[in-house]
A protein has these predicted regions:
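Pre-P-loop entry segment of helicase/translocase ATPase cores
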Residues: 409-417, 424-441
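Charge-patterned, long linear interaction tracts outside catalytic cores
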Residues: 158-177, 433-442, 450-464, 476, ...
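Glycine-rich phosphate-binding loop of nucleotide-binding enzymes
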Residues: 429-513
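Switch/coupling segment of Walker-type NTPase motor domains
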Residues: 84, 475-577, 581, 585
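Short secondary-structure boundary/capping segments
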Residues: 96-100, 191-195, 395-399, 503-508, ...
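Non-catalytic, charge-rich alpha-helical accessory subdomains
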Residues: 341-342, 358-359, 369-375, 564-621
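Flexible, glycine/threonine-enriched loop-and-boundary segments that flank and lead into catalytic domains
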Residues: 228, 232, 236, 419-433, ...
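Extended, folded cores of ATP/NTP-driven motor/assembly subunits in large transport
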Residues: 1-421
């Protein structure tokens, strides 16, 4: 039975009670974007967009940490922060490329589309990794109130979510908005528990399969009996091994940082080391705030006990240093609490996944080496893998025994340095895919026209000679063209380097050099699209396009003939107006349209027409 856990006999030879997979997920229902557990807990999950923290200036980093510390002070008592890595899902991007290819009229460009699609498929199936970040918190009832209504619970959780949105915006993070919050929560658990199946079977298809299986029971009320876990649980879960568990064709191992496994001092954003360790590495951070008054009392009591012990200990005894350090640490915590900081217990759980036991052991060894290089330590949760697995679920419910064993006491300032929403990714939705980030294997996709992310679309490509600046520019231009974005490249000295690219995409090459058949008609008038400006500033009064063009032509001629007199400028102005009038163009913008060909411009004059008008007048001949 795929729904029954496989467990090993205990040391006394007794089999552990058989338990179904449904029992592992204590989810009673999902409603209003809230998880209702079977233990009468109400869980809210928010997805957070990360920032590239390490590229920010020291001043900006301090600002982020201070804002995160402010968030911790007003957040619920128990928090879980989760980062989740998996193979990048490029299906949505591939669908967009296929639509662009279908709408492309040029057969040669469609061939380039097919090549681009194959490239994206290869990256998505082999190299690319995507990361998602979550914060999980639960409803915490006031101690002096009873009979709280469900509406009040929802309101409290929504208020907490708004606080996260406000303070995280100060950090530079945004909360991802989902059209259907209930479906989002289901997808989170489905993806976490079915790492292999979720790549091949989307959630919607899984939902249809579950509905079909219940309808096959010929029970009119079958759909009402479907538990939420039915859409999430993996096909199998093997718990027979002490060092790992096997779930949905993937091996999972769980490690934790012991209380003495941290460095004495860490820098802000140090968790970027773990978060960006690579594919198959997930990180869970648990924080639990303690009552300040009770902790002040306990710390003071422990200081007094240690001071009494150290009086009876010789300074040559090995215990003397331990007691001395404990006393100093106690005073440090006491001073911090007196300076308006809070006391927290923190624990970090690291999940390592792989397709085989060999790969799993290799990844465990590599992540341990990485931590040792930073003077930190990781311990495998041997024979506690099930408890660690349940702790890793986004339910803000770490196993009590594990949390007590591995927790570390910290203050607010230290907790803020655990800021987890750190990533090296540059992956913009609807951007042009450039490749894979070699530092953390994330996709590099750029959409510099996204006003939601960037203040403007300006971009600079810097590098040494031969580093690939021109190639990068060609790559961006090529893939923007494949995405249907018009691309213009002005290359005064390196135009020959773009010639082959333009020919391959059936582009137009314009050479502005002496003897070239191509030239620019400086007298051409084209209406400017003011749609974006009107959206920002409202409707603006219409201005004459001819008047604006005449002003620009005066600037043009003043550069050619700097010593024009006022009388000559007046004569030139009259000649320009006459030249446009001869083509039927007046100060009215409607005169720009060609009545013989609706939707097209009239034939525009050229400098030769202006020369003819000047030559025909006696005063300008």
């Amino acid at each position: 039975n795929a729904q029954v856990l496989q467990r090993k006999a205990d040391r006394h030879g007794k089999l552990v009670k058989r338990q179904t997979l449904y029992d592992l997920l204590p989810i009673e229902k999902i409603e209003n974007g809230i998880l209702h557990t079977t233990h009468d807990r109400y869980i809210k999950i928010l997805e957070i967009e990360p920032i590239n923290f390490l590229l920010r200036s020291p001043r900006e980093q301090r600002s982020v940490i201070y804002s995160f510390a402010s968030l911790l002070k007003v957040s619920p008592v128990r928090l879980q922060f989760k980062s989740f890595s998996r193979k990048a899902d490029v299906n949505a991007y591939l669908d967009k490329l296929r639509r662009d290819a279908a709408n492309e009229p040029d057969a040669d460009v469609r061939k380039r589309h097919m090549s681009y699609i194959r490239f994206v498929k290869r990256l998505g199936s082999r190299d690319a990794v995507s990361r998602r970040f979550f914060v999980i918190f639960q409803y915490e009832a006031p101690t002096n109130e009873r009979n709280i209504s469900y509406a009040e619970i929802v309101s409290t959780l929504e208020t907490t979510a708004r606080n996260f949105r406000t303070y995280l915006a100060q950090c530079g993070n945004a909360i991802v908005e989902h059209e259907n919050e209930d479906e989002f929560l289901t997808d989170v658990f489905y993806t976490l528990l079915n790492r292999r199946t979720a790549v091949q079977v989307p959630l919607q298809e899984r939902i249809q399969d579950v509905l079909a299986s219940y309808l096959a029971q010929n029970d009119a009320t079958a759909l009402d009996k479907i538990p939420p876990a039915a859409f999430m649980i993996p096909p199998s879960l093997d718990l027979k091994h002490g060092r790992y568990l096997y779930m949905d064709g993937t091996y999972h191992a769980y490690l934790m940082i012991p209380a003495d496994g941290y460095r004495a001092q860490v820098t802000a954003g140090w968790m970027a080391l773990l978060v960006n360790a690579g594919e198959g590495i997930d990180v869970d951070l648990f924080l639990e705030r303690q009552p300040k008054e009770r902790m002040m009392q306990k710390i003071g009591q422990q200081i007094r006990i240690n001071r009494s012990k150290i009086k009876d200990t010789s300074d040559t005894n090995s215990d003397f240093d331990d007691l001395s350090n404990a006393i100093r640490s106690g005073y440090y915590l006491k001073d911090g609490l007196a300076n308006n900081e809070d006391f927290y217990y923190a624990a970090i759980l690291v999940t390592v996944t792989a397709a085989s036991v060999k790969d799993l052991e290799w990844r465990i060894g590599e992540i341990r080496k990485l931590m040792v290089s930073q003077d930190m330590n990781l311990q495998l949760c041997s024979f506690r893998q099930e408890a660690a697995f349940l702790s890793s679920l986004p339910l803000c419910a770490p196993d009590a025994a594990l949390f007590k064993k591995y927790r570390r006491n910290i203050l607010t300032s230290t907790a803020a340095s655990f800021y987890p929403f750190v990533s090296f990714e540059l992956c913009d939705t609807n951007g042009v895919l450039l490749g894979v980030n070699k530092y953390n294997n994330s996709l590099v996709s750029l959409d510099n026209f996204s006003t939601r992310i960037y203040k403007n679309a300006n971009m600079a490509i810097l590098g040494t000679s031969g580093a690939g600046k021109t190639f990068t520019m060609q790559l961006i231009a090529r893939r923007m063209r494949l995405a249907g974005t018009p691309v213009y490249i002005i290359a005064p000295l390196k135009g020959h380097e773009f010639y082959r690219q333009a020919k391959a995409l059936n582009g137009t090459i314009i050479r502005i050099v002496p003897g070239s058949p191509d030239c620019i008609n400086v007298m051409e008038i084209r209406k400017i699209d003011h749609t974006s400006s009107e959206l920002l500033d409202g409707p603006m009064p219409e201005q004459s396009e001819l008047a604006a063009k005449i002003q620009k032509l005066h600037i043009f001629f003043s550069l050619l003939i700097p010593d024009l007199s006022n009388e000559e400028r007046q004569l030139l102005d009259e000649a320009i107006v006459t030249t446009y009038r001869n083509k039927g163009i007046t100060y009215s913008n409607a005169s720009l349209d060609d009545p013989a060909h609706p939707g097209q411009y009239r034939e525009m004059p050229i400098l030769g027409d202006l020369h003819a008008v000047l030559s025909s007048a006696p005063e300008t001949r």
